[in-house]
UniProtKB/Swiss-Prot annotation:
One of its GO terms (biological process) is negative regulation of transcription by RNA polymerase II. The keyword Glycoprotein does not apply. It is found in: Nucleus; Cytoplasm. Disulfide bonds: none annotated. Residues 97-126 are annotated as: Hinge. This is Vitamin D3 receptor. Belongs to the nuclear hormone receptor family. NR1 subfamily. SMART domains: HOLI, ZnF_C4. Zn(2+) 2 binds at C60, C66, C76, C79. It comes from Saguinus oedipus (Cotton-top tamarin).
Length: 427
């Protein structure tokens, strides 16, 4: 039995290397595969099967030791059959006519099952494909992977341990236009374009008033060296989020009031989602092209935030990165995040929910159709959990932001758009 097991074992994978020519072990002709436990050509395979089925007895007309080749293999059937047995061909591997028929039926059945399975497999509808195409285009128009606009921000200033500071470039440049300076060269397209939401729309909502006299909330100015630069970065990102949101299918069908509510409440969450593209797990930083724009945890603390926000933010970024989302999934997740019917203050929750359901169904179908396992396993549920994590991060960001915005020294470093979006808390 051990000998039988050995003879029926699969050949070494190296034997199937397509770059290595397959040679028939009987006659030396080109082999077509393993037949009856040996590598042979089609001719010797058929010869062995016929001989075994007929129980043929051959006699060598010579000395019983003929050399079998492709050219003379028909001259001596006895030595050819002997050679078949010598290289390991076994009659036990030959199927009966009934077994051959059953095998054919099984192959046919398997093909039919595969065809049925394929027909039942979910497919993206034309409408869903259109939604994905629109969102991809929206993202490409509002996210610059070269980060070339970062040079227009107020420069990053990183305070040394000894108290000194080193701006990455001369500090003479004024705050760019996205912080409210209309004379700057930076475009305000996503705020002031007739097709887009005007940033002044946000100013209809009053700033929240909270008591900031608690000395534990006071931040020394020396701790805020990165605040001007990161405030400009966030202001710039808010504009891009507005531009992306305006291109979400169905978003323009909402009232301007609901659009404002959704954008104000989701802006920081979408910014966190967007930033995952530049996040690297090698050193837990956000790398945005130029080394001056490589942001570490210490940079975020120098903008007034503490580990109560930073630690869960890093955990979120790592978890999201490990999901290895396709770009299609990434843009759908951002859209779903923005169009959330449970945001406080929305008026037409039913319409918002209908838009979000359409996006969610598209995401689920895309995962089933296009994201291969094992990555697709529970992927949708994991992505929805990320949205829940963002709500917690949003809440903590709001708490820490208030500490900044209600201190005149620090709020002066913020931009008007940041003050309007994050200062008018809807809670």
């Amino acid at each position: 039995m051990e000998a039988m097991a050995a003879s029926t074992s699969l050949p070494d994978p190296g034997d199937f290397d397509r770059n290595v020519p397959r040679i028939c072990g009987v006659c030396g002709d080109r082999a077509t595969g393993f037949h009856f436990n040996a590598m042979t050509c089609e001719g010797c395979k058929g010869f062995f099967r016929r001989s075994m089925k007929r129980k043929a007895l051959f006699t060598c007309p010579f000395n019983g030791d003929c050399r079998i080749t492709k050219d003379n293999r028909r001259h001596c059937q006895a030595c050819r059959l002997k050679r078949c047995v010598d290289i390991g061909m076994m009659k036990e591997f030959i199927l009966t006519d009934e077994e051959v028929q059953r095998k054919r039926e099984m192959i046919l059945k398997r093909k039919e099952e595969e065809a049925l399975k394929d027909s039942l497999r979910p497919k993206l509808s034309e409408e869903q494909q259109r939604i994905i195409a629109i969102l991809l285009d929206a993202h490409h128009k509002t996210y610059d992977p070269t980060y070339s606009d970062f040079c227009q921000f107020r420069p990053p200033v990183r305070v040394n341990d000894g108290g000194g500071s080193h701006p990455s470039r001369p500090n003479s440049r004024h705050t760019p236009s996205f912080s409210g300076d209309s004379s700057s060269c930076c475009s305000d397209h996503y705020i002031t374009s007739p097709d887009m939401m005007d940033s002044s729309s946000f100013s209809n909502l009053d700033l929240s008033e909270e008591d900031s006299d608690d000395p534990s909330l006071t931040l020394e100015l020396s701790q805020l060296s990165m605040l001007p630069h990161l405030a400009d970065l966030v202001s710039y990102s808010i504009q891009k989020v507005i531009g992306f949101a305006k291109m979400i299918p169905g978003f323009r069908d909402l009232t301007s009031e609901d659009q404002i509510v959704l954008l104000k409440s989701s802006a920081i969450e979408v910014i966190m989602l967007r930033s995952n593209e530049s996040f690297t797990m090698d050193d837990m930083s956000w790398t945005c092209g130029n080394p001056d724009y490589k942001y570490r945890i210490s940079d975020v603390t120098k903008a007034g935030h503490n580990l109560e926000l930073i630690e869960p933010l890093i955990k979120f970024q790592v978890g999201l990165k490990k999901l290895n989302l396709h770009e299609e999934e990434h843009v759908l997740l951002m859209a779903i995040c923005i169009v959330s019917p449970d945001r406080p203050g929305v008026q037409d929750a039913a319409l918002i929910e209908a838009i979000q359901d359409r996006l969610s169904n598209t995401l689920q179908t895309y995962i089933r159709c296009r994201h291969p396992p094992p990555g697709s396993h529970l992927l949708y549920a994991k992505m929805i959990q990320k949205l829940a994590d963002l709500r917690s991060l949003n809440e903590e960001h709001s708490k820490q932001y208030r500490c900044l915005s209600f201190q005149p020294e620090s709020s002066m470093k913020l931009t008007p758009l940041v003050l309007e979006v994050f200062g008018n808390e809807i809670s």
